[in-house]
Swiss-Prot record:
The lineage of its organism: Eukaryota, Metazoa, Chordata, Craniata, Vertebrata. One of its GO terms (biological process) is proteolysis. PANTHER family: ACROSIN-RELATED, HYALIN. This is Complement factor I. InterPro entries: CFAI_FIMAC_N, CFAI_KAZAL, FacI_MAC, Kazal_dom, Kazal_dom_sf, LDL_receptor-like_sf, LDLR_class-A_CS, LDrepeatLR_classA_rpt. Ca(2+) 2 binds at residues 276, 279, 281, 283, 289-290. It comes from Pongo abelii (Sumatran orangutan). Its EC number is 3.4.21.45. Belongs to the peptidase S1 family. It comes from the Eukaryota.
């Protein structure tokens, strides 16, 4: 019976048909993650807007000239025209205050306004707007109103924390002679309602009109049932991890073990609205929201009179114009074989990012090709005094009987050690090798090598994810291996339980099998621990660093956690070489 329970538990997680039940709403939220105060500007959790760039885990403003040149002219509230929407948003990001007004050129009479009517205070009421090319003001339809639109409207009115999720505007019997209202759709992170899409609808009375109460510090004192947003706003704990951006800064949706209702849970711990699933735009940084979308039915939009340009479509178009980096995708399909120590021989093309670092004694360490002329490896593998003696061997699967027609051998121009590398503790055990360029060539040519992608976020992969370690190391009986080996290992959450205070969680990653059957060993150092995302794109998640008793249970391998060094790597090799997103 016990074996049956274990088997069912395995099926539950492997086939993902079991739902996790949490005893309380608080159990949905990851407390350790909350302490990091992630928001919509945390590019470790979400993608930056196309007018932003990711630096040290935060989305910061681009300079206008860094935007794509193609686009349509837009007008800002200061009466200035911009060549593209991206340039206008970039300048607004740098100098908040001047907002988007309309798509197209500026006109003298062009004006957009939003106001609240029939409220007792200036923070509540029925929402009324005047569109740029309309002569009269109109109310917003209730049917289209959600927290997305409410937060944007309040932000537009100067309430920095958006809409109040607890309070409701109390409508009395009103006499409103209006047969039409405006349907509005926002993504939720706009800074003005003018950026949202408006269409015209018919209305039957004031009950069909949208109202809002904007959040103020005069709200009720918080209790234990409240969730505190990073921006200081309090919402009900029940509203966390439901796929709805109640906070306005998205902080209630970024540290979730699971999601409520029909919202979609990203592996990175983010909850997104169900309508973002299979909508043609990747919202999860791990990409799984756009996987398995064959036959996925999209919701047909009702035919109505569209009054404003779709600036969200323009945002998506700008994203499509950003530079694309090719990495982590092999030319041939990887063939999984029965499950380095306990590993299997690699075939040509299995590991096109793997390189061997050779000195006078042979291949002593592995490395990872990350693009251009750059190899990533472990600092403990190298000696600065031997820089010009090292060779980089690519497409090697057997270094006793190498295929000379396929192998490319490159020489090393310089080595960059991490400035805080500690040889005693293996902290910051990471280094870069720049290969020499041939003659007057601007770049290195490695025709059969494919760079592995460099991860920018520590949330791309999670404990228990299956990854691949490879190298020319020794077997557990210390027997030398001459052919490239690979094996599947699982990421392990925290190796302090195995290695005590010698394991530094921020800088190191653990991986192995619980029985020790597959492990990195002596000679594998500097080589890759690679993981694949939902789209089968390969990332170098770790660099083989150290461990004890290789191939033994409870002694998993320890790797340098590459995501922790994204900014260090990009500083030396150039951000365009390794940035897939947020550029």
């Amino acid at each position: 019976m016990k074996l049956l329970h274990v088997f069912l538990l395995f099926l539950c997680f492997h086939l993902s048909f079991c739902k996790v039940t949490y005893t309380s709403q608080e159990d949905l939220v990851e407390k350790k993650c909350l302490a990091k105060k992630h928001t919509h500007l945390s590019c470790n959790k979400v993608f930056c807007q196309p007018w932003q760039i990711c630096i040290e885990g935060t989305c910061i403003c681009k300079l206008p000239y860094q935007c794509p040149k193609n686009g349509t002219t837009v007008c800002a509230t200061n009466g200035r025209s911009f060549p593209t929407y991206c340039q206008q948003k970039s300048l607004e990001c740098l100098r908040p205050g001047t907002k988007f007004l309309n798509n197209g050129t500026c006109t003298a009479e062009g004006k957009f306004s939003v106001s609240l009517k029939h409220g007792n205070t200036d923070s509540e009421g029925i929402v009324e707007v005047k569109l740029v090319d309309q002569d009269k003001t109109m109310f917003i339809c209730k049917s289209s109103w959600s927290m997305r639109e409410a937060n944007v409207a309040c932000l537009d009115l100067g309430f920095q924390q958006g809409a109040d999720t607890q309070r409701r505007f109390k409508l009395s019997n009103l006499s409103i002679n209006s047969t039409e209202c405006l349907h509005v759709h926002c993504r939720g992170l706009e800074t003005s309602l003018a950026e949202c899409t408006f269409t015209k609808r018919r209305t039957m009375g004031y009950q069909d009109l949208a109202d809002v109460v904007c959040y103020t510090q005069k709200a009720d004192s918080p209790t234990n049932d409240f969730f505190q947003c990073v921006n200081g706003k309090y919402i009900s704990q029940m509203k966390a991890c439901d796929g709805i951006n109640d906070c306005g800064d998205q902080s209630d949706e970024l540290c979730c073990k699971a999601c409520q209702g029909k919202s979609f849970h990203c592996k990175s711990g983010v909850c997104i609205p169900s309508q973002y699933r299979c909508n043609g735009e990747v919202d999860c940084i791990t990409g799984e929201d756009e996987v398995g979308c064959e036959g996925f039915a999209s919701v047909a939009q009702e035919e109505t009179e569209i009054l404003t340009a779709d600036m969200d479509a323009e945002r998506r178009r700008i994203k499509s114009l950003l530079p694309k980096l090719s990495c982590g995708v092999k030319n041939r399909r990887h063939i999984r074989r029965k499950r380095i120590v306990g590993g299997k021989r690699a075939q040509l093309g299995d590991l096109p990012w793997q390189v061997g670092i050779k000195d006078a004694s042979g291949i002593t360490c592995g490395g990872i090709y990350i693009g251009g002329c750059w190899i990533l490896t472990a600092a403990h593998c190298l000696r600065a005094s031997k820089t010009h003696h090292y060779q980089i061997w690519t497409t090697v699967v057997d270094w006793i009987h190498p295929d000379r027609k396929r192998i490319v051998i490159e020489y090393v121009d310089r080595i960059i050690f991490h400035e805080n590398y500690n040889a005693g503790t293996y902290q910051n055990d990471i280094a870069l090798m720049e290969m020499k360029k041939d003659g007057n060539k601007k770049d290195c040519e490695l025709p059969r090598s494919i760079p592995a992608c460099v991860p920018w976020s520590p949330y791309l992969f999670q404990p228990n994810d299956t990854c691949i370690v490879s190298g020319w190391g020794r077997e557990k009986d210390n027997e030398k291996v001459f052919s490239l080996q690979w094996g599947e290992v699982k990421l392990i959450s925290n190796c302090s339980k195995f290695y005590g205070n010698r394991f530094y969680e921020k800088e190191m990653e653990c991986a192995g099998t619980y029985d020790g059957s597959i492990d990195a060993c002596k000679g594998d150092s500097g080589g890759p621990l690679v993981c694949m995302d939902a789209n089968n794109v390969t990332y170098v998640w770790g660099v083989v660093s150290w461990g004890e008793n290789c191939g033994k249970p409870e002694f998993p391998g320890v790797y340098t956690k590459v995501a922790n060094y994204f900014d260090w790597i990009s500083y030396h090799v150039g951000r365009p070489f390794i940035s897939q997103y947020n550029v």
